[in-house]
From Swiss-Prot:
Cytoplasmic membrane side: 1-22, 71-75, 86-96, 160-165, 232-293
Gene name, Swiss-Prot/TrEMBL: Aqp6
Listed name of the protein: Aquaporin-6
Gene3D superfamilies on file: Glycerol uptake facilitator protein
Superkingdom: Eukaryota
Main location: membrane
Extracellular topological intervals: 44-51, 119-138, 186-189, 203-210
Compartment annotation: Cytoplasmic vesicle membrane
Length: 293
């Protein structure tokens, strides 16, 4: 074998897995911090019970922090509903979406476990688990979560779409989360994020009506993705391109172009880079097959 071929392939594999691991860790960390701070704001301290405004502001700030931390690394999903919306809109591949959701659920569980560990016993019993309040029926609860998540995902797409804005999306997405909490707390405690509901439920073992906080948000996310990507701001992807993105055989899988105004010379230099060695071609083919490239 020609000297240097496999060394270049090794570097390519290392770079690939570094990028993948960074994105997954960003989703894990962002979701964990979101759950720790957000759910921490709803704990029933006897000295002073949290107000709806306090909870909404805390979730606002937690969201903005999570987004700012991860948006240039993973796209700042931190929410299985957002990831599903991106999948439906043909912005990420199925393998990447599955990996993101796994990282988000793990991060949410870790964040809830940390919160549980640092909270006194009498206060951590329910750990902010989402439940239905004020005689709200299960059907009404699903509908509320659907609408709340729909507005959130629409805001996520609009805030992170490079065709619309180049600014950081953290503040606007945080505001959308706060809006949902100002209304949704009275109905369901406001989830809009299956991972937020999943983490605390796992730690305290309370899964009553837990399905609501998957069905409602995921349905709302799908509807929001269809509205944004096919009605409000449709793109020009063909069916073949969408299928290629779904299975991960193309790199065109982002709605967000973090640096859409790169110099033309940089683009040209990237376009002229060729992988000529057998090892490099094999690694590139492997990464496309996984849909993680």
């Amino acid at each position: 074998m020609e000297p240097g071929l496999c060394s270049r392939a090794y570097l390519l594999v290392g770079g690939l897995w570094t990028a993948i691991s960074k994105a997954l860790f960003a989703e894990f960390l962002a979701t964990g911090l979101y759950v720790f701070f957000g759910v921490g704001s709803v704990l029933p301290w006897p000295v002073a019970l949290p107000s709806v405004l306090q909870i909404a502001i805390t979730f606002n700030l937690a969201t903005a922090t999570a987004v700012q931390i991860s948006w240039k690394t993973s796209g700042a999903h931190a929410n299985p509903a957002v990831t599903l919306a991106y999948l439906v809109g043909s912005h990420i591949s199925l393998p990447r979406a599955m990996a993101y959701i796994a990282a988000q659920l793990a991060g949410a569980t870790a964040g809830a476990a940390l919160l549980y560990g640092v909270t006194p016993g009498g206060i951590r019993e329910t750990l902010g688990v989402n439940v239905v309040h004020n005689s709200t029926s299960t059907g009404q609860a699903v509908a509320v979560e659907l609408v709340l998540t729909l507005q959130l995902v629409l805001c996520v797409f609009a805030s992170m779409d490079g065709r619309q804005t180049l600014a950081s999306p953290a503040a606007m997405i945080g505001t959308s989360v706060a809006l949902g909490h100002l209304i949704g707390i009275y109905f369901t405690g406001c989830s809009m994020n299956p991972a937020r509901s999943f983490g605390p439920a796992v730690i305290v073992g309370k899964f009553a009506v837990h399905w609501i906080f998957w069905v409602g948000p995921l349905t709302g996310a799908v509807l929001a993705s269809l509205i944004y990507n096919f009605i409000l701001f449709p793109d020009t992807k063909t069916v073949a391109q969408r299928l290629a993105i779904l299975v991960g055989t193309t790199k065109v899988e982002k709605v967000v172009d973090l640096e859409p105004q790169k110099k033309e010379s940089q683009t040209n230099s990237e376009d002229t880079e060729c992988l000529t060695s057998p090892c490099e071609e094999a690694v590139r083919s492997f990464s496309f097959t996984l849909g993680l490239c």
